[in-house]
Amino acid sequence: MIQIYNRKTKQYDIEQVAGGRLLNTLYTTGRGRLGLKLLVKRKIYSSLTGFFCDSKISRKTIKGFAEKFSIDTNECESKVEEFKSFNEFFARKLKPSARVFDTSEEKLLSPGDGRLQAWENIDTEKLLQIKGMTYSLSELLQDEKLAREYSGGTYLILRLCPVDYHRFHFFDSGKCMETRKIKGEYYSVNPVALSKIPELFCRNKREYSIFKTDNFGDVLFIEVGATSVGSIIQTYIPGERISKGAEKGFFKFGGSTILLIFKKNMVKIDDDIIMQTKEGFETKVLAGEAIGNCIDKRTK
């Protein structure tokens, strides 16, 4: 059972996990771990899943999936019957009114829908993936020099579930550099998997870019793939001027994760998110939701 903090009600909701029973089998039993090693973590499994989700026949699963997980299809730009495949629905665009991005310069906004955790004054060689398990930023990036620049900074994990809106956005205006792609496995990013697989983020397929923001400095914007995520699609144009709230890209079917890493003294995350993280809970947020503030440039 996964409890998620709800900022509106100030209560804890129980997360509905798509394929929860299968996840537990794969990551907590000997038979499951064998299947994980031989097939599920590999690209071929994600490719086959992606092939089905791109097919016309997969559209028949959309209505049932949306109903089971209480997805508000009224937020979609397109009607449910207009989607030609499950992946089209999974990577759906929303009406502009469904996710509103505050244009205030000082506000840090969530880049996507998901479950958020945040840490301040980080040791880049001991980043948490879950309580009791750490990994190295230099290994994640495969760049020791770049990783050192973020020592003492702020680190955010935004975990997306299959039921979430899977497009992600720029949380500030600025320019985003070229994306670097790193090959890897396709482990789940569910807490069950994170608690069983050491250095999972460093093992999975991932992409990162340096987002040169107007108000938060140079931020590492990292996308981590997961089980069934055959593709991380970047839709932005590197080096071009970006407006706050503009789309950066999207994930195809599966769970996935976004990591944001800020340099020291650039951002202050909201107290409730920091407190919940310390208590071991994730906080549910939506794309465009305020999650912190930039630190006044005059104090730097």
Curated annotation (Swiss-Prot):
User: Positions of the site: Cleavage (non-hydrolytic)?
Assistant: 255-256
Q: What is its EC number?
A: 4.1.1.65
Where is it mainly found? membrane
Keywords recorded for this protein, A-Z? Cell membrane, Decarboxylase, Lipid biosynthesis, Lipid metabolism, Lyase, Membrane, Phospholipid biosynthesis, Phospholipid metabolism, Pyruvate, Zymogen
- Give the Gene Ontology MF terms in alphabetical order: phosphatidylserine decarboxylase activity
Which cofactors are named for this entry?
Answer: pyruvate
What note does UniProt attach to the cofactor annotation? Binds 1 pyruvoyl group covalently per subunit.
Compartments, record wording: Cell membrane
Task: Tell me the first and last residues of the signal peptide.
Answer: none
Q: How is it modified after translation?
A: Is synthesized initially as an inactive proenzyme. Formation of the active enzyme involves a self-maturation process in which the active site pyruvoyl group is generated from an internal serine residue via an autocatalytic post-translational modification. Two non-identical subunits are generated from the proenzyme in this reaction, and the pyruvate is formed at the N-terminus of the alpha chain, which is derived from the carboxyl end of the proenzyme.
UniProt superkingdom: Bacteria
* Active site, per annotation: 113, 169, 256
Q: Which Gene Ontology CC terms are recorded?
A: plasma membrane
| Biological pathway | Phospholipid metabolism; phosphatidylethanolamine biosynthesis; phosphatidylethanolamine from CDP-diacylglycerol: step 2/2
A Pfam family annotated for this chain is: PS_Dcarbxylase
**Record function comment:** Catalyzes the formation of phosphatidylethanolamine (PtdEtn) from phosphatidylserine (PtdSer).
* Quaternary data: Heterodimer of a large membrane-associated beta subunit and a small pyruvoyl-containing alpha subunit.
Family from the record: Belongs to the phosphatidylserine decarboxylase family. PSD-B subfamily. Prokaryotic type II sub-subfamily.
Please state what the protein is called. Phosphatidylserine decarboxylase proenzyme
Point out the gene that encodes the protein.
psd
